Regions:
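Short glycine/proline- and charge-enriched loop/turn segments
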Residues: 308-316
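A short acidic, glycine-rich active-site loop
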Residues: 267-268, 317-323
Length: 467
């Protein structure tokens, strides 16, 4: 019987072990999509407890705790202590067997704090106290944790109206790890939301544009896009339910925009026409700036209205959707390609039934301008686990070029999520090692090592043009 989470965790063959320990493990981390709070990096935030670091804002854990029968006050409440929240999480952990949370929890304890005991009610107090004691040390600050995991670059997720002051502060402080903003204009796209007009007014104010028409909005966005570029931004991200290809005219979009600004109800068709027009304009800006564009699609968000009204978005009430969007995706990418305005693109699906859809879509629009111009993003959100990442890499392997994959990202708000890169790299090495063991791949150590190092780091470094 193997030991739990020993040095060869997930590595089932000698080839896998060699690839990980001698190649993957030594590569720095480029975390090109995350949700870190820039202020915490800029001010080198010191965490008052493991509860703040681990449970503050982590909807993955909240979701598991609720499922385990834990009252909401121990997840998001303000009338419970840090210890009480941690204790409830420790009570939940033994029930997360076979959930990625169990692996993540113990990888984080091991790599950050050197703790190899399993978290449970029996060990909760001891682990809580040891973590909190270490969090008082300088090397456990926000920046210290990034250094610990050999992070080289992170890309935060930022709204067009953000002033990026904390990115500038971090840059000017001489911090050796790059923190780059990423453009996420969802609030300008979501015309059906009740606060759309209010947001447009804020956008106009920040951009210095009197915003009354769609053209005004595009002008305002372009100014903010330029501002982001001046501050080092190299990529955009769009959270969409599906792709849109409904035909529209400029006059139709102006009419739709005017209705929304007056607070009038829009039809489903009008909403889709606007989103198509918006994403088209956004893609044109990205192409002109030589950015990479990312599309995360397929989530049904904020399913629980009662809890949304209490807690807001991103609190653990989202799920996988069923959207038939392959044709619209193809039409949208083709439209950009026909006009010579299709920039480097990463496609992420939340529903794994679309893995092969995306993996085959990539080849339609590769043009030889760079390796893997159109990418299949790593297993996202609910797929960020062994089975989901395996399925994503298998689909990419058989229908594209796994060797040109830009690899892993945390997509996380936590400074303790970097072991997910290790988790991914171990899995990658194991997939290749097993293929060698079965005679499906040659035991070409040089080629295998290069492939692992490229997917772990080199491909992302070359693809995003951060340097």
């Amino acid at each position: 019987m193997k030991q739990f989470m020993d040095e060869n965790f997930l590595l089932e063959t000698e080839t896998a072990q060699d690839l990980f320990h001698n190649h993957a493990a030594k590569m720095p981390i480029i975390d090109y999509h995350c949700h870190l709070i820039p202020e915490m990096v800029a001010n080198d935030h010191k965490f008052k407890s493991i509860t703040e670091l681990w449970l503050g804002g982590d909807h993955y854990k909240w979701r598991a705790m609720r499922t385990n029968g834990v009252d909401e006050r121990y997840c998001t409440g303000t009338d419970t202590t840090d210890w009480e929240k941690f204790e409830k999480w420790a009570e939940t952990v033994p029930y997360t067997f076979r959930n990625p949370l169990y692996h993540w929890t113990h990888l984080e304890l091991k790599t950050a704090f050197g703790i190899t005991k399993q978290l449970s009610p029996k060990t909760a107090r001891e682990i809580y106290d040891e973590c909190n004691e270490k969090l008082q040390l300088p090397e456990y600050s926000a920046r210290g944790l990034m250094r610990r995991y050999h992070v080289e670059c992170v890309c935060t997720t930022d709204d067009p109206i953000d002033d990026l002051r904390y990115h500038k502060q971090t840059r000017e402080s001489g911090f050796e790890i790059k923190m780059i903003p990423a453009w996420r204009p969802d609030k300008a796209m979501n015309i059906e939301k009740p606060d759309f007009a209010e947001y447009m007014n804020k956008l106009g104010e920040v951009a210095g544009v009197t915003l009354t028409t769609f053209k005004d909005m595009v002008d305002a966005l372009q100014k903010r896009h330029d501002f982001f570029a001046e501050n080092g931004c190299k990529l955009s991200d769009h959270g969409i339910e599906e792709f849109y290809d409904e035909p529209y005219t400029d006059s139709q979009i102006e009419t739709i925009f005017a209705k929304a600004m007056r607070g009038q109800q829009l039809s489903a068709l009008e909403i889709r026409q606007y989103k198509h027009a918006f994403l088209k304009v956004s893609a044109e800006m990205d192409h002109a700036a030589d950015w990479t564009q990312q599309y995360h699609y397929g989530a049904i968000r904020d399913n629980n209205t009662l809890m949304y009204n209490k807690l807001g978005p991103d609190t653990g009430f989202d799920s996988i959707g069923e959207f038939t969007t392959a044709k619209a995706m193809s039409n949208f990418l083709n439209e950009l390609n026909m006009e010579g305005k299709l920039t480097r693109t990463i496609l992420y699906c939340l529903n794994p039934c679309a893995n092969e859809v995306i993996a085959t879509m990539l080849g339609n629009f590769q043009d030889g301008s760079c390796p893997g111009k159109i990418q299949f993003g790593s297993g996202w959100w609910f797929n960020d686990q062994l089975d989901g990442m395996t399925k994503q890499m298998n689909a990419l392997s058989v229908l594209g070029l796994l060797s040109r994959f830009v690899g892993m990202l945390t997509d996380s708000r936590s400074f303790l999520s970097y072991p997910r890169h290790e988790y991914f790299r171990r899995l990658l090495c194991n997939l290749l090692g097993n293929d060698v063991e079965k005679g499906l791949l040659p035991n070409d150590k040089e080629s295998l090592a290069r492939m692992v190092e490229d997917i772990s780091y080199n491909n992302a470094r070359n693809y995003f043009k951060f340097y």
